[in-house]
Every structure is written in C-alpha cells, then in structure tokens.
Amino acid sequence: MKNLKRILQFNKLWLLFGIFISIYVIFFTKIIRYSSKYDGDETQVRGKITSIKLDGNKLSFNLRAKENIIVNYYIQTEEEKNNILTLIHLGDMVYLRGSFSEPLDNTVPNTFSYKKYLYNKRIYYTFNASEYKIIGSNNLFYKIKDKLFKKIYNCENSDYYLAFILGDKSLLSSDIYDAYQKNGISHLLAISGMHINMLVLVISKVIKNEKKELFVTSLFLLLYLFLTGITASIVRAILFYILKKINKIMNLRYSNMHILILSAYFILLVNPFMLYDLGFIYSFVVCFGIVYYSDYIKGNYFMKLLKLSIITFLFSLPVTALVNYEINLLSILINIIFVPWISLLLYPFTLISFIIPFLSQILSFFIEITNNVNVFLENFSLLINIPKMPVVFVISFYLILLIKKKQNIIFLVLIIIVCELLPVLDFNYYVYYLDVGQGDCSILVSPQRKETIMIDTGGKVDYKTDDWKTKRKIYHLSDNTIKFLKSKGITSFMYMIITHGDADHAKESLNIMKNINVKNVVLNNGNVNCLEKEIVSSGINVTQKYNLKYFNIMNLNNDLYDNENDNSIINYVTFLRYKFLFMGDASTKVEEKLLNEYDLTNINFLKVGHHGSKYSTGKNFVNKLKPTYSIISVGRNNKYGHPNEEILNNLSDSKIYRTDQDGSIMFKIKKNKLRIKTYSP
C-alpha cells in the first residue's frame, strides 16, 4: 500500500499537470468534433507521398494534402507492378484522379473499427485512384527514407529487416505474424527501449563526453524517428531515452517513473489522439509495469527473465483481452525462450547483416529456426477465452497490480474467472443477424449460453487469380465473426446449420470450425458439393436431428429440387412466444408449397429469402406470414441489385432491417421483452 501511495502522491505540480493533460485530451478528442477539408465529391487531389505499401496488385500510400489521405491504387499488369517502385518514391508530389470514399465503421459488434482508427489519425477519407502523375521530386530526408525502404524491400529477409529496422510488420506472412500474436510475443517485433539502446551503443562507445553524446544521439534518433514513421512505441522509447540522459547529465534526480510519465504527458500534449493508439497503450502499460516492479526484478539471469515475463504478461493482459478476447497462458514460458533469442541474437544480427550483406544467409538460417519454433509452439498454445471485460474490471485489475502483495494474484485470477462466468450469468435470449456482406450468417443464443446455434456462415467465391496479384495476408470473411463470438464468450456451437452449399452461405464454415468448437453440422438433402465434402471429411458429426431444450427448430423443406437454392433448409424456430423463419435462398415456388403444407401465420421475425431477390418473398407469402420484422442480409452496393424494390414493397407493412444499411442486428429477449440494436456502418 505504501508503494501505491508513493505513486499516487506526486508533488502538486505533477498532479496538476496530470489533471490538465486529462482535461486537454478529453477536450480535443471527445468534445471537439473534427471534419474533413474535402467535400468528398472531388475527383482529383494532389499531395506528397509519405509512406508506401505494396501488397499483391494493391498499392497503398499515405498522401499529405490539405489533410492526410489514404490512397489505394490497383495495379493493372505484372509489368506495371515490377516497375512501380522505381516510378513512385517517398516524398514525391503526385496528382491523382479518382474518387473519395468514407471509411466504414465496424458493423459487427466488438470488432476493429477502421473508421475510428483513421479518425484518431485525423484521416477522414480514402481515395481510390484510377490514375496518377508525378509532379515533383522528393527532398533529401525523403530520398534517404525512400532509398532505405527500397533497399530493404528488395532484400532477402525483407520481412524481418522491415520489422526490426523500420518497425513495419506488413511484409511478415500472415501465418508467422499470427503465431507471434497467439504465442503472446508480438511485442518483440515492436521497436522498444532495448532496440534504441542497441542502436546508439556505437555512438556511446565512440563519444565519451556525455553532452556531446546526447546531442549526437538525439539527432540520430530524431532522424530514425522520421524514418520509422513516428509510431507511438518508437516515440515513447526515444523520448524516454533522451529524457533519461538529460536527467543523468543535469543531475535532476527524477526517477524512471517520473521520466516515463513525463514522456506520456509530452506525447499526449503534442497529439492527444495518441491515447487511443494501441501501440501507445501497450508500450506505456508494459513499461509502467516494468519500472514499477523494477525492485523485484532481481536474481540470476533466468530469474530476472522469468519475473520480467510475468510482469509483462500481467500488465498487458487486460489490453490483450480487450483486443483479442483471449490470452495464451503459456506466453510467459514462450517469452523466456524468445526474449533472449530475439534481443541478444536475431535483432542485433539483423542489423549487422543489413550492413554486411554476405551474412544474410546466416540470418536466413536464424529466421528459419525462429519461424519454425514459433509456429510449432503455436500448436501447443493454452488459449483461454476472456469475453469483453467491463471497464470496472479493467480498472480493478490494474489497481490490484499496484498493490505489491503476492496474495493479490488470487484477486487477479478471480477477476478473470468472473469475466469467464459473466456470459453464464446472462439469462437473456439473443438472435444476431451478422453483417457478412453479400451472404448470410445468423446466431441463436439461449440463456446462460447453454445452447448456441449458427445458421450459415457467410463467405464469397474465391476466384483464381495470378500469383502477382495475391495478397500476403490470407483474409477470412469470418475473422470478424470469430472475434465477435469470442467477445460474447461463445466458444462452441451445438449446431452449425448450413442451409445450402453456396459460397455466400457456407464458405466460411471451415475457418469457423478451426477456431470455434462445432459439435454438430446440419446439411440439406441436396447434392453434396466440394465444400460440404470437406466438412464431412473433417470428422464432425453430421445430422438432421436436434436435441434442444431452449429452442424448437423444424426444417420445413425436406423435398429435393434441381435448384440448390430451393434445396435450402428452411428453419422454423420458436421459443417463448416468438416465431422466427429463416428462408435461406428458397424461391417463390418453395414458398407456395410451404403455404399449402404449414400454418405460417403471424411470424414475428422473417429472415428474407435470397437477400431480397425478386425470385423470393412473394406478395402472397408475405400476406400470409404477416411478419412484424423482416431482416434482409445483403451486401453494400452489390452487383445483383438486391434487395429488389418490388420485394421491399411486399414487406412494407413490416419493420425492415437491412445489413447493408443497419449493419448487424441484435434482438435481445428477456421475459418476453424485446430490445433491438443495430450496428450501422
């Protein structure tokens, strides 16, 4: 408790400055609302290129114009791709023709918001360029940065060179970076104080005068900051290093904690939006923990490493849980393996081999070992799901960490256990219609998560493309779905119902099965396609029978048609006093048959068939059902013209929700009381 008081009871100047910074950040980030200097309908723009990324056939760069803009340009030929980095340089002035696009917010709850991410960087638009023209060359600093970037990009081992030298992880393959993240060691790829100390080691050895050394290293580090693109973790590391040197030379006697907090104050004063930068949060939270517990990091090398890994793990846990909704309990041990390997061998050897290129073959060997061990250990990850932590839990977790008592670990574990139990203590029903673009994905959740059911998974057809167009990262449409599920504490499904085998309904099933425990899969009576064969061959139990307590589910369509859409499983779901009908992609022909065979009146929730196509949801069918709510799962600006205007007219007596306009839709039912929430883009 004394240590906690010591941290909280700064002198009045520090405390007042902290209060001022807090008010300052809130005022400039929450009260003032910023808007673009562009109208959004401009078709041309000019500015300076400040960063470049090339991935497959997509060239992206940051353009400094009236304001910062993200520019996307799609390369037309392989020859153009091979030459484009010799034509476009960092610092070039360019003239562009194309169109502005406003970034979309996250339409699936608890997932990454690209719109908020760009807003916090004061970027309000992306620009889709159709043509470009270089109208001015770059200056000296940008020439240095451009040459360094191009040299790294064309090197063998460019992925690690770019990560360790410029702090850019974009060239790392998705498999390798995912392994770093799952193993809890992705922080080793971020440039930190250790890297900064290593970079200036030579200068400190050559220049003995401390003031001259500070001057030279400060210039060098400021240049390095410019080269790396001024990211939060690098700014923190450099500022901390410089302030620590000043503190020593001027004999100011400030503690490392004072210097760290002063660094945070300074960064937030210059850019208050840094408070929402994930790199800033991770960097300061972990560094705070290390400085705060520095007295405990004692003993032999192994013990120091173990204690450091535990401190890093604990202080980063709430942030990691809020981002990924899971943590790897083995990351402490994995850090003990990788921290010395990367910090003492791989990182310094990467710098040396970049300067002495003939050593790159040895570096390749070290990288291969690193990647193989990393991927191998990923298979033994001990991942536990942590549903979205309430703010009060996060604050409590850190307050307990500030009280230096060994028995407090019990309270930290209790917080995690309670987080785990929160979904089990939820006695509501939920039905989610997730925004998966031009596809279908619905989720049923019973009280206490005792029964969870997924109806379709979403997806899209993978068209064969040339190798030069292929992106480095394998993107799955269901990655957002999986993150959402984990945020809600849903780690398994009793049933995954695939209404039919079309890609927009079933393509993401395998990726979901890889990440979420699916106990049973329900397939329709139609012919089994290649995707469905993969599902069956995975060894999962395939059934058409349900054993449920909270939901009553009937498949109303057991006939066999020539058209796969008409073979769709039509799910009639009832619970409490509510009736749900999920039509898959069934056409009006099947609808008429249903009306002849079943009493389908006063349906509360109609999942409209075939994304609102004109071949489904006939007037007669709607008049009979009299749906209260109609949900259309449809992609924004889709090429099919869905939903059809006639279908919207047919449904006009019901409340219509569309995923292209409303995003994901949640229906929460508690004691027959209905609450509706949408997540519009």
Report each predicted region and the residues it spans.
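Hydrophobic alpha-helical transmembrane segments in multi-pass membrane proteins
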Residues: 2-8, 13-23, 127, 176-332, ...
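Membrane-interface helix/helix-cap signal primarily in integral membrane proteins
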Residues: 3-7, 18-187, 465-467, 476-483, ...
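Aromatic-rich juxtamembrane segments at the membrane interface
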Residues: 120-240, 245-246, 314, 494-495, ...
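Core dinuclear metal-dependent hydrolase active-site scaffold
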Residues: 272-275, 378-381, 385, 389-392, ...
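Alpha-helical transmembrane segments of multi-pass integral membrane proteins
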Residues: 288-387, 628-632
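Metallo-beta-lactamase
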Residues: 491-504, 606-610
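Active-site HxH/HxHxD metal-binding segment of metal-dependent hydrolases
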Residues: 497, 503-537, 627
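Cap/insert and terminal regions of metallo-dependent hydrolase folds
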Residues: 593-664
